[in-house]
Amino acid sequence: MPFFTTDDGICLHYQISGKGTAVILLHGLTASSLYFQKQIPVLAAHFQVIAPDLRGHGQSETLSDHLTLKRLALDLKQLLAELKISKASFICWSMGAQIIFEYIRNYSCGDIEKIVIIDMTPKLMKSADWNCGLPGIFSRKQGDFGHEDNLYLLSVMLDNWEAYSKVVAQRILNKSLYNDKMEFNTAADFKGKEDLPWLYEEAKKNKAWVVAAFWIAMSTQDYRPVLPTISVPCLLTYGMESNYYPPENYEYMQKQLPDARVIAFAGCGHALHIQDPELFNNTVLEFLQSCPAK
């Protein structure tokens, strides 16, 4: 299995398969490259696919510091240099999208061909001028999710990660699976139900302090000013059953991005690429194989 060492001495793991134009898969918080296991073989039939484990995730190492989005963007820059990749397309799920936003803020779009965003917002927290942030379900309640709710979430996360990791795994699925008391209905049928035991086990493997540090990094960012600077074609995908962000988020992003299209996935939540891999893979292949970036 390939690894490379960053300039701060961290050994990072990545998967690589296929030949041709590079496509980089960036996973979300608490996940790993394994969360793209339904995409890698399909995409590798057409492209060279690289799927890194972000620092602190999967088989990659971490330090107690440098747990920031700026560092993750630098890790990505160094991985591209290590593999001598001068141009690539990126498929970015959740935190992976914030990494590519941070990457563009620091390094521009010069080495980017196209971008696919999976169920993500440019700003996690709601504010007076932003109503497309996280909802109250993130603190197990109805309504909005504010600063105090975020602190509560962090305290629960750090108190008992094994218990909270189950909540994380459930929350990336469908919002219709929750009742008014924010209780998850495991008996219901939904897309991707067969993956739930695996999602539980994978989520448990994370370190609470790593997750908390990256969550703070994510929740303090506002990438709205970056969107108009993204000069490459973008595909915005989201789950119509997502617990995370409303459709208005993607309408806003489409208006701010110079070249973007939006596709909603019925019956899917935050993990739409896991829940409906065939539709997702076909949609992404069509986008990546369409006319190249200008």
Predicted regions and their residues:
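Conserved hydrolase catalytic core segment
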Residues: 86-131
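Conserved alpha/beta-hydrolase catalytic His-Asp/Glu region
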Residues: 127, 152-229
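Conserved HGGG/HGGXW glycine-rich cap/lid loop of the alpha/beta-hydrolase fold
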Residues: 6, 10-65, 79-80
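Alpha/beta-hydrolase active-site loop signature
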Residues: 30, 54-58, 97, 122, ...
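Catalytic histidine-centered segment of alpha/beta-hydrolase-like enzymes
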Residues: 268-281
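Flexible "cap/lid" loop of the alpha/beta hydrolase fold
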Residues: 112-161
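Conserved acidic catalytic loop of the alpha/beta-hydrolase fold
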Residues: 70-88
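Conserved loop-alpha-helix segment in the C-terminal half of the alpha/beta-hydrolase fold
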Residues: 228-268
